[in-house]
């Protein structure tokens, strides 16, 4: 890729996040690599065949952990071919015809497991929590978590962008549907995202965001969400199809839709002076519990629509 084209693609990324807000990455690249790297330290807990596989192909696994986010414009595909679904994860695994591709496919499944927590719990709750501001949307809360990712993880992201994963890409290209962009264009944009992490300005922006906001994301808060995501990764890898996390939705569609409606209702009540912040805090605590319970029991999310 020429230097000019790379700069052009990097320049497109902020615009694309505005044009396709629904494609905002649930956990960002940094968090997914952090979670995947953690799982590679827990191999002794996995079934023997996965211990052997991931020990031999750790980089392919990590590439799989971020490859589900290659596609931009996901909502423009048929729901049966949405890349953030267990259906597609199974198809990727079925298409893996050698060990390196299988490691990538298991990384893809780990990505989906982590996103069940991000899209079904973390982001929906934060959207409701900041009901009295109009600016803090989906992408904002994903960026907030990225601000706490260690420098070593960003270095890993840049290293992966320079690896040759063409075999894995051919597998993914054969399974993942094109959107408004071809797989090749999506991949170039994605590589630009990984290289973007080298820019000090990007990391400085994330750090400044955390220091100046009135909406804290405390260490205890982060641990709650990320520990749950680690549990989802590990349990799905151990139990596979028997894992209760397979009932959770990686897109979080139902939870996000309900959260949007509740956020609007809370905002209207607050603006009309019919809801104090103390009353809202009490209600939000109950709603947070319902979201968490609904991860593995999606039908219980129906309670949110009548909250």
Predicted regions and their residues:
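Alpha-helical transmembrane segments of multi-pass membrane proteins, especially transporters
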Residues: 107-108
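N-terminal leader/auxiliary helical segments
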Residues: 2-104, 115-307
């Amino acid at each position: 890729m020429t230097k000019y084209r790379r700069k052009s693609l990097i320049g497109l990324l902020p615009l694309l996040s505005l044009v396709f807000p629904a494609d905002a990455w649930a956990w960002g690249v940094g968090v997914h690599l952090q979670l995947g790297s953690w799982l590679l330290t827990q191999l002794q807990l996995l079934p023997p065949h996965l211990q052997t596989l991931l020990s031999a192909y750790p980089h392919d696994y990590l590439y799989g952990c971020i490859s589900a986010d290659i596609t931009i414009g996901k909502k423009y595909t048929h729901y049966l071919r949405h890349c953030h679904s267990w259906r597609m994860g199974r198809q990727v695994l079925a298409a893996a015809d050698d060990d390196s591709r299988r490691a990538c496919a298991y990384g893809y499944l780990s990505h989906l497991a982590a996103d069940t927590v991000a899209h079904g719990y973390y982001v929906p709750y934060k959207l409701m929590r900041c009901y009295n501001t109009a600016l803090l949307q989906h992408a904002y809360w994903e960026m907030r978590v990225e601000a706490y990712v260690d420098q070593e993880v960003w270095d890993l992201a840049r290293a992966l962008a320079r690896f040759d994963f063409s075999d894995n890409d051919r597998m993914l290209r054969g399974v993942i549907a094109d959107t408004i962009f071809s797989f090749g264009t999506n991949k170039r944009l994605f590589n630009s995202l990984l290289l973007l992490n080298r820019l000090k300005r990007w990391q400085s922006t994330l750090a400044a965001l955390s220091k100046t906001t009135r909406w804290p994301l405390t260490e205890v808060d982060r641990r709650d969400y990320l520990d749950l995501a680690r549990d989802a990764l590990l349990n799905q890898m151990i139990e596979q199809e028997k894992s209760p996390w397979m009932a959770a939705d990686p897109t979080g569609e139902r939870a996000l839709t309900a959260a949007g409606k509740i956020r609007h209702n809370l905002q209207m009540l607050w603006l009309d002076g019919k809801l104090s912040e103390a009353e809202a805090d009490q209600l939000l605590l109950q709603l947070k519990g319902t979201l968490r319970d609904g991860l593995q029991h999606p039908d219980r999310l129906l309670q949110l629509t009548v909250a």
